Amino acid sequence: MTAIQLIVGLGNPGPEYEQTRHNAGALFVERLASAQRVSLTADKKYFGLTAKFSHQGNDVRLLIPTTYMNRSGQSVAALANFFRIKPEAILVAHDELDLPPGVAKLKRGGGHGGHNGLRDIIAQLGNQNDFHRLRLGIGHPGDAKLVSNFVLGRAPRAEQEKLDASIDFALGVMPDVLAGDFAKAMRELHCQKA
């Protein structure tokens, strides 16, 4: 079992994107930083906001890229390469169109599923896709032509409450994730639904 050394929250920078569906991953990392009582600070070297905490004697780094979504890999690769963090020790939290609001799922490896942030991370890590993902359901607008406006839009209150609940569920399994016990974390998380 590989312990997680880097947790990345995907989103777009700037106040106009803060509360959008596409920033679900960044919201997760902000909440995790708060729970760990650490502050995210800008670090130009890694093109993002970073923080560090210790879990069972291991350093865990948090990262929210301040690049736009489609350049997230630049930030992830800069930090992972500097600290020699292998893809299997990385967890990327991101919005997931294929899951309804209120559902969060863990997954290891796989393709990008059309997600530009994941696409760039895979490319910047040398086409290695063996990192873990925390998929935070945001639902789908029903028509592929509506996806861009949908992900860049703000969720109605009921949807946002479900997303917040799924983030709470995910935070609850983080001790198992950080220890590398993904099987236990998946069993617990995949039974939850807001």
Curated annotation (Swiss-Prot):
CDD domains: PTH. The record marks 12 as: Discriminates between blocked and unblocked aminoacyl-tRNA. The keyword Cytoplasm applies. Its main location: cytoplasm. Its EC number is 3.1.1.29. GO terms for molecular function: peptidyl-tRNA hydrolase activity; tRNA binding. TRNA binds at residues 17, 68, 70, 116. Gene3D superfamilies: Peptidyl-tRNA hydrolase. The active site is at residue 22. Keywords: Cytoplasm, Hydrolase, RNA-binding, tRNA-binding. The keyword tRNA-binding applies. It catalyses: an N-acyl-L-alpha-aminoacyl-tRNA + H2O = an N-acyl-L-amino acid + a tRNA + H(+). GO terms for cellular component: cytoplasm. Disulfide bonds: none annotated. It comes from the Bacteria. Pfam families: Pept_tRNA_hydro (PF01195). Hydrolyzes ribosome-free peptidyl-tRNAs (with 1 or more amino acids incorporated), which drop off the ribosome during protein synthesis, or as a result of ribosome stalling. Catalyzes the release of premature peptidyl moieties from peptidyl-tRNA molecules trapped in stalled 50S ribosomal subunits, and thus maintains levels of free tRNAs and 50S ribosomes. Belongs to the PTH family. Monomer. This is Peptidyl-tRNA hydrolase. It comes from Pseudomonas entomophila (strain L48). The lineage of its organism: Bacteria, Pseudomonadati, Pseudomonadota, Gammaproteobacteria, Pseudomonadales.
